[in-house]
Amino acid sequence: MRRHKEVNFVAYLLFSLLVLVSAALAQNCGSQGGGKACASGQCCSKFGWCGNTNDYCGSGNCQSQCPGGGPGPGPGGDLGSAISNSMFDQMLKHRNENSCQGKNFYSYNAFINAARSFPGFGTSGDINARKREIAAFFAQTSHETTGGWASAPDGPYAWGYCFLRERGNPGDYCPPSSQWPCAPGRKYFGRGPIQISHNYNYGPCGRAIGVDLLNNPDLVATDPVISFKTALWFWMTPQSPKPSCHDVIIGRWNPSSADRAANRLPGFGVITNIINGGLECGRGTDNRVQDRIGFYRRYCSILGVTPGDNLDCVNQRWFGNALLVDTL
């Protein structure tokens, strides 16, 4: 009888542990969970867990879906109140030119619809923090998709989102991977706003947004909502040892002593380091870095917010290897 009770007790403990682990995994949210939302009525805590007590929803404890932080009157809730359709069109003024590969693909509605899957984006902090994040996101992605040149009409920084697919004759971007195996005949070159590339980025991104991008990578270039979601996923997802772009720009990231020794301080420059630091940072003045800053300053001006400090990564050391590698 005692042996029977011991077996039952062990089974109960194992069952309880599985329930707790399952619940914990299911509740991961916010920037720690790739921008996932909590169930209705719950808040996402600053640590990335869902709940409805003060530990999750209280002032200073909540990162998204906070009390009083529900959708506003605009079409995208708080996001729509920070960037209007007319601002979007002004920022990406020449995206629909005949010379642009992405003509009539990138739209305000697609952006707003995609952002609903990442409720912390453009809705965290005060209005200045929200606008600064939007400006930074569009600056970095505009650099990746720019069709501008020095003497372009309205200047080079009015030509973001001109391109959709990587130019030239890109390869298949398919290193061997047992976790993210490439589908026959598929290529994983740069597509969309962030120009996501490689099977090891398409795979986890697709899993996070609920789309099989390993078998259908060209959805990033044919479905505008999915296209924006891939860029937002990259923006919201930490890449250890890198923080997420989101956490940096809203001021949530606290650099370690190693970061400070590497001159990686909070600001737009660290985001460039996250995205393409191995090629652009710590190498002296770089035209690509300056191009990103040029877009950022223009968008901050349109949105009516100051750009903040530490805009370049000229003296920063690269973060090094990460869970996800650079998109380009």
UniProtKB/Swiss-Prot annotation:
One of its GO terms (molecular function) is endochitinase activity. Residues 322-328 form a propeptide. Keywords: Carbohydrate metabolism, Chitin degradation, Chitin-binding, Disulfide bond, Glycosidase, Hydrolase, Plant defense, Polysaccharide degradation, Signal, Vacuole. SUPFAM superfamilies: Lysozyme-like (SSF53955), Plant lectins/antimicrobial peptides (SSF57016). Gene3D superfamilies: 1.10.530.10, Endochitinase, domain 2, Endochitinase-like. Residues 1-26 form the signal peptide. It catalyses: Random endo-hydrolysis of N-acetyl-beta-D-glucosaminide (1->4)-beta-linkages in chitin and chitodextrins. Disulfide bonds join C29-C44, C38-C50, C43-C57, C62-C66, C100-C162, C174-C182, C281-C313. CDD domains: chitinase_GH19, ChtBD1. It is an enzyme of class 3 (hydrolase). The keyword Hydrolase applies. GO terms for biological process: cell wall macromolecule catabolic process; chitin catabolic process; defense response; polysaccharide catabolic process. It is found in: Vacuole. Its main location: other. Defense against chitin-containing fungal pathogens. Belongs to the glycosyl hydrolase 19 family. Chitinase class I subfamily. This is Endochitinase. It comes from Solanum tuberosum.
